[in-house]
Amino acid sequence: MSDSTWMSADPHLASSLSPSQDERMRSPQNLHSQEDDDSSSESGSGNGSSTLNPSTSSSTQGDPAFPEMNGNGAVAPMDFTTAAEDQPINLCDKLPPATALGTASYPSDGCGADGLRSRVKYGVKTTPESPPYSSGSYDSIKTEVSGCPEDLTVGRAPTADDDDDDHDDHEDNDKMNDSEGMDPERLKAFNMFVRLFVDENLDRMVPISKQPKEKIQAIIESCSRQFPEFQERARKRIRTYLKSCRRMKKNGMEMTRPTPPHLTSAMAENILAAACESETRKAAKRMRLEIYQSSQDEPIALDKQHSRDSAAITHSTYSLPASSYSQDPVYANGGLNYSYRGYGALSSNLQPPASLQTGNHSNGPTDLSMKGGASTTSTTPTPTPSSTSTSRPVPTAQLSPTEISAVRQLIAGYRESAAFLLRSADELENLILQQN
C-alpha cells in the first residue's frame, strides 16, 4: 500500500523538477556512471534521495521501500512503464531520475532526454532545419511576389525600350490560334488596317510610349469601330508593329513593308477596302457635323480677310468631294438664303452637283453672285493666276475662321485617305506580282 502511494506520488514530485535542475542532477551522475557501474549505483542511490527533492528525502527516510525502489534499476522501469500508461506527459518529465539511477548506457539517450528534450529537440530542429525549408518557401514566395513588379517592368519596358521582348515580333499575326471562333480573314484585314493607319499617322521608328497620345487613341477608336471584335488587341498590335519596324530598320532590311503572303488574301483585302471606305465616310461625316455646328455658332460674315483665306485655300491641290456640300442658312447682305454652300473656290477639281445649281435659285442680287461664283468654279477647274485675278472681284460666300480650320483638317484627312488608298493599291499590285 505504501509502495503504491509513494509510486503514485513520485511522478508529481519528479514533474516539479525544472529542466535546469534535472540537467544539473543528471550531468554529475552521468560522469560517475562512465567511471564504474558500482559507484554510479551507489551515488545514484545516495544522490537519488538527496537531489530529487529535500522534502521527499526527509519525509521518506523511515520507509525502506523507497530506497529499494530507487536503488534497484530493474524495479524502476517496470513501475515507470505502468505509470506511463496512466500519465505519459508526466512520465516524460519524471523519467530523468530513473535514467540517472539506471545503467550507464541508457541514461544518455533515455526517455528523460527524449521527454524533456523531445520538445526542445523538435523545437531546435524546426529552428535550424526550417530556415532551409522556410527560406526555400520564402524564395519561392519572393520570386512570385517580386515577379509582379519585375513583370510589370518588363511590360513597361517595350514602351521605353526598342526591342525588349523579341518573341512577339508578329505575335498578333502568327497567333491565329488565339482567334478561335473569329473569322481569320477579318483578323488579317484588321492587322493590315492597323499597319496602314500606323504608316500614315505615326513615326515607325518611335516607340508607342513616345507617340502622340491622341493619334494612338484615334487609331484604337478606328479599329474598335471597324473591327469591334478585335478592339482589345488594337493597342498591342500597334506596339508590335512599331517594334517590328524598328527591328527591320536595325537589321538593315528594306522598309517597303511587303506583306507576307500568309497574312493576306483577296477576301481580307476586300474587307480592308470596305473598312477603309467606311472609316473615310465616317470621318467626313464627323467633319461636316463639326463645320455645321461651328457655322451655327458663328454666322458667316463678309470680310476681306476671309476672302484672302479662301483664296489661299483655292490653290490647294486637293478639294472637297461633292458629299461635303451641306445645307445650312447663309447670311449674305442682310438676307437669309437657305441654299447649298458650295465653298465656291474650294472645289477646284470637281464639278458641283446638279442640285447645287438648281438650289441656288432665289431672289436678290446675292443669289446671282453666288450663282455666278458657282458657274465660275465649274468653268475653271484648275485656276491660273490670270483666272484668279479675274474671278477675285466676284463676291462669294465667305467662311469663318473656325470653318476654315475645320475644312483644312478635312483636307488633311482626305490627303491621308488618298495616300492610304494609294498604298493599298500598291500592296495589291505587289501581291499579284508575287503570286504570279
UniProtKB/Swiss-Prot annotation:
The modification Phosphoserine is found at residues 130, 295. InterPro entries: HTH_NOL4, NOL4/NOL4L. The keyword Ribonucleoprotein does not apply. Residues 41-61, 375-396 have a biased composition (Low complexity). Pfam families: HTH_NOL4_2nd (PF23079). Residues 1-184, 351-400 are annotated as: Disordered. Keywords: Phosphoprotein. GO terms for cellular component: cytosol; nucleoplasm. It comes from the Eukaryota. Residues 160-169 have a biased composition (Acidic residues). Residues 170-184 have a biased composition (Basic and acidic residues). Residues 351-366 have a biased composition (Polar residues). This is Nucleolar protein 4-like. It comes from Homo sapiens (Human). The lineage of its organism: Eukaryota, Metazoa, Chordata, Craniata, Vertebrata.
